[in-house]
Every structure is written in structure tokens, then in C-alpha cells.
Regions:
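Conserved small/polar residues in nucleotide/adenosyl-binding loops
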Residues: 152-154
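Soluble, cytosolic/nucleoplasmic coiled-coil alpha-helices used as oligomeric scaffolds and tethers
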Residues: 64, 88, 95, 99-102, ...
Length: 154
């Protein structure tokens, strides 16, 4: 299994596990061994799922300003946790490939590996939510078709 396939498998599991309760306050039950890359990938996606739903909550035009401020602080902490975890995942790669010597003409073609993995995690959430929109029965056929097209392009 490639590393990206491992990521996708774990991200999908975390995404579907989160949506069992669909609550930003639900405790995470990470099935992977503590301090393994699998554990960190699951945690990464869980943080992203919670953050996704924090953003939904804060966009509510009827949100109480006091609740909004408290939520903003939770979002800030979540962002810091996310960044710290990305750095930890990058450390995993630095250690794993510490003996590899780059070629003299090597170029950097992306962000760090962990930020690329971050994009895969967000992509898993986008795919999940687009599929939810496709399956809704309380929307128009046009909306569902548009979401189906969007999901196919994600």
C-alpha cells in the first residue's frame, strides 16, 4: 500500500467515525497505537473534521456574540493544534529519510510532505460532504446534480 493510500484509508475512517456523532464535542476514539504515524494521521483528520464544523457553527448569523467569541478561541486553539501536528508529521518524514541525500539538481516542488498530507485530509472531508449533499432528499435535483459533478471533480 502506498503512503497516500494509507492516508486516504485512515482519513476516510476518521471522517466517517466523526460523523457518527457529528459533534464538535464528541471524544475521539483513535483506534491506532499511540505515537504511530497512523495515530497521527487519524488525529490530523479528526482535528480537520472538528474545525470544518466549527466553521459551520461560526457562520450562523444568529450566533450569540459571547458564544462566537468562545468558539473563535476554540478555532484558534484548533488551528495551533493542527499546525503542531503537521510539524510532528514532517518530523516523521525527516527522520524516516534522514539518510537520503538529495541530488545536486533537486528542486522543491510542493510544500512540506505534511502540508501535502493536510490537503489530502481536507480533500477527504470535501468528498464526504459533497456525497452527503448528493444523497440529500430535501434539495432540488439541480442541486444534487451540481454536487455530483463537484464530487466527481474533487
Amino acid at each position: 500500500m502506498t503512503f497516500s493510500n494509507l492516508c486516504n484509508e485512515i482519513f476516510w475512517k476518521s471522517t466517517t467515525d466523526y460523523h457518527v456523532t457529528d459533534s464538535v464535542d464528541a471524544p475521539m476514539n483513535n483506534p491506532y497505537e499511540l505515537k504511530t504515524i497512523e495515530y497521527y494521521l487519524y488525529l490530523k483528520n479528526w482535528i480537520d473534521a472538528v474545525q470544518w464544523h466549527f466553521e459551520d457553527i461560526i457562520r450562523d448569523p444568529q450566533i450569540d456574540p459571547v458564544e462566537a467569541l468562545a468558539l473563535k478561541r476554540r478555532i484558534d486553539k484548533s488551528n495551533q493544534d493542527r499546525t503542531d501536528l503537521v510539524e510532528l508529521i514532517d518530523s516523521y518524514f525527516l527522520d524516516k529519510y534522514k539518510e537520503v541525500k538529495p541530488l545536486s539538481d533537486a528542486t522543491i516542488n510542493t510544500e512540506s510532505p505534511a502540508w501535502a498530507i493536510d490537503r489530502l485530509s481536507i480533500l477527504a472531508l470535501k468528498i464526504y460532504h459533497m456525497q452527503q449533499e448528493v444523497e440529500r432528499t430535501d434539495t432540488t435535483e439541480e442541486h444534487r446534480a451540481q454536487c455530483q459533478i463537484g464530487r466527481a471533480h474533487v
